[in-house]
Amino acid sequence: MPIIEQVGAREILDSRGNPTVEVEVGLLDGTVARAAVPSGASTGEHEAVELRDGGSRYLGKGVEKAVEAVLDEIAPAVIGLGADEQRLVDQALLDLDGTPDKSRLGANAILGVSLAVAKAAAQSAELPLFRYLGGPNAHILPVPMMNIINGGAHADTGVDVQEFMIAPIGAPSFKEALRWGAEVYHSLKSVLKKQGLSTGLGDEGGFAPDLPGTKAALDLIGTAIEGAGLKIGSDVALALDVAATEFYTDGTGYAFEKETRTAEQMAQFYEQLIGAYPLVSIEDPLSEDDWDGWVALTSAIGDRVQLVGDDLFVTNPERLEDGIERGAGNALLVKVNQIGTLTETLDAVSLAHHAGYKTMMSHRSGETEDTTIADLAVAVGSGQIKTGAPARSERVAKYNQLLRIEEELGDAARYAGDLAFPRFGVESK
């Protein structure tokens, strides 16, 4: 059995220049593995708590308290446990913290240990992480949902929608999908330059031009797809992350595109969009606690487009189960740091799949070079991954890892392609 012998932690920087936690786990057999924890910009109210130091150091965003929690409390609790007993290790972490939202030790401390333990166990077993976690049937490469125009909390512009994504669903392989995405990305840069628009980048590597609204951004992307010699819809579909909680005020409504709108008016807007553009997915179209609005929206357009719960579900099995029972959404966004342990993440994915919900593996806007989510996407067969534009090394690291996995799988590899969205026939519009 691969016994945990050492647990270390340090403060490192993420892609936004803010501190985050990195954990190293050493086993008795000499194996050493490392995991770094991401951090979000638009965070759901119901996410597990990220422990920050406060004070003047790093403008209050230091994580020395979380590092100390790993070294002083977590390490003694897990040393001596088997790294291949992931559920047992994660339960020990939950019991030690003792709070429902991981606010005592911090989800950033707990997750770092949870992921590093899994990576150490995989290395000790001489298995790639995707194979260790997913078993012999893990072979599906996800569609890269590339965020090529950044708005909302990810950019300092007037665009309310947070992410405009392309989904190369018609590609024959992940390798080709990545090429298509990169070519559309470069085509978009040329389109923006020709129109005198900014080619500055947002947090996730996408361009951040100041545009009049959602339709203008989608039109630009459509032009870029055609400029890359691809067909909009059948080759490359479109997707949005609206992050509607960011512009929702309780009692007032949605302050969207210079108007105050109700949930019903937002639903009408989305219905118009999916009629005009080949949209396969809309994430967080309504606020995280607007359950009635979500249920009505799902009833209205859920048979025509994927409706992804991010802030709504926060990768939490309990909130997801509530949503499934209500009929809210039809897909789960998976962010490991929203819930804080690998076991709970896997439980949420399993619950979603058993209920017929799709899953999309996701990065955070504050990322590191850690590639765990790439392996995790293949391990659970999510069929979709979003990890930013094909730019900035913390984003590209995940795409490059998926290239390696596809190569390692060889003839057994299958690219999810348009089957990632089996209920939604997408044609050029």
From Swiss-Prot:
Mg(2+) binds at residues 241, 283, 310. It is an enzyme of class 4 (lyase). This is Enolase. The gene is eno. (2R)-2-phosphoglycerate binds at residues 162, 335, 364-365, 386. Belongs to the enolase family. GO terms for cellular component: cell surface; extracellular region; phosphopyruvate hydratase complex. Binds a second Mg(2+) ion via substrate during catalysis. It is found in: Cytoplasm; Secreted; Cell surface. SMART domains: Enolase_C, Enolase_N. Catalyzes the reversible conversion of 2-phosphoglycerate (2-PG) into phosphoenolpyruvate (PEP). It is essential for the degradation of carbohydrates via glycolysis. GO terms for biological process: glycolytic process. Its EC number is 4.2.1.11. It comes from Mycolicibacterium gilvum (strain PYR-GCK) (Mycobacterium gilvum (strain PYR-GCK)). Its cofactor is Mg(2+). The active site is at 204 (proton donor), 335 (proton acceptor). Pfam families: Enolase_C, Enolase_N. InterPro entries: Enolase, Enolase-like_C_sf, Enolase-like_N, Enolase_C, Enolase_CS, Enolase_N.
